[in-house]
C-alpha cells in the first residue's frame, strides 16, 4: 500500500529531483516556484507526496484553504497546472507503467476525497490517463494543448493573424530565451503584484 502525506520542507529536494527527471515538468512544478508564489500571493501551498515505503514516487502541489468553512485543495495561482508528478518507472511493459500511474493517481484522488470538500488537479497534457479520477467519481474534463518546437516550426503554416502578432512582438524587441535564473521570474511576479497594491 502507498502512503500519502504532505512533504516536509526538507523533502523538497527529493521532489525537485523527480521534477527535474521529467520532460513534461517545468519551473511551475519546482518547489522554489511554489514557495515564491506562496510568498507573493500569501497562500498556503503544500506538496502532497505519495510514498512507496519511504521512497517518494509521486505527488501533486496544492493550494490549501478554507472556503465558506470547507477545506479545499486547488490549483496554484499564477501557475498553469498543479499536475500529478509521477517518478518515471523503468519498464518495457506499457501495462506495468499504466498500472503504476493509476495506482499513484488513485492514491492522490482518495487522499483528496477523504480530506477535502473540494479539490482541483489540473494535469499536464502528458498525464494522459485520468481513469483513476473517473473511477473515484471525480468530475473530469480533458482539455487540449499544443506543444510547438519553435526551432522547427513552419511559421508560413500559421494563420495570418498569428504571424502578424509574432512579427509585432519581434519588432517590439520581445525575445525568448531559456533561463535557469529563478530570481528573474520571482522579481517580475513581485513587481507585478506590488503595482496592484
Model-assigned labels for residue ranges:
Residues 53-54, 89, 149-153:
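Short loop segments at secondary-structure junctions
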Residues 2-81:
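Amide-forming acyltransferase catalytic core, primarily the GNAT-like/NAT-type
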Residues 16-19, 109, 186, 190:
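Non-transmembrane alpha-helical segments in soluble domains
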Residues 67-140:
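Acyl-donor binding region in acyl/amide transferases
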Residues 1-12, 132-197:
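Acyltransferase donor/substrate-recognition loop-hinge adjacent to the catalytic core
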Residues 49, 58-61, 118-123, 175-178:
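A structural signal for short, well-ordered beta-strand segments and their strand-loop junctions
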Amino acid at each position: 500500500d502507498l502512503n500519502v502525506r504532505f512533504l516536509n520542507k526538507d523533502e523538497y529536494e527529493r521532489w525537485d529531483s523527480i521534477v527535474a527527471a521529467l520532460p513534461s515538468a517545468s519551473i511551475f512544478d519546482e518547489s522554489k516556484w511554489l514557495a515564491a508564489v506562496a510568498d507573493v500571493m500569501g497562500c498556503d501551498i503544500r506538496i502532497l507526496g505519495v510514498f512507496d515505503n519511504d521512497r517518494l514516487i509521486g505527488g501533486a502541489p496544492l493550494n490549501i484553504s478554507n472556503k465558506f468553512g470547507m477545506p479545499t485543495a486547488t490549483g496554484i495561482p499564477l501557475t498553469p497546472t498543479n499536475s500529478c508528478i509521477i517518478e518515471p518507472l523503468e519498464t518495457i511493459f506499457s501495462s506495468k507503467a499504466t498500472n503504476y500511474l493509476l495506482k499513484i493517481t488513485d492514491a492522490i484522488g482518495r487522499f483528496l476525497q477523504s480530506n477535502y470538500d473540494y479539490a482541483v488537479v489540473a494535469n499536464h497534457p502528458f498525464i494522459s490517463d485520468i481513469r483513476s479520477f473517473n473511477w473515484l467519481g471525480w468530475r473530469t474534463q480533458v482539455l487540449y494543448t499544443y506543444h510547438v518546437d519553435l526551432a522547427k516550426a513552419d511559421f508560413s503554416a500559421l494563420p495570418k493573424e498569428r504571424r502578424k502578432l509574432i512579427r509585432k512582438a519581434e519588432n517590439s524587441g520581445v525575445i525568448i530565451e531559456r533561463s535557469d535564473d529563478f530570481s528573474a521570474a520571482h522579481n517580475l511576479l513581485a513587481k507585478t503584484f506590488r503595482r496592484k497594491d
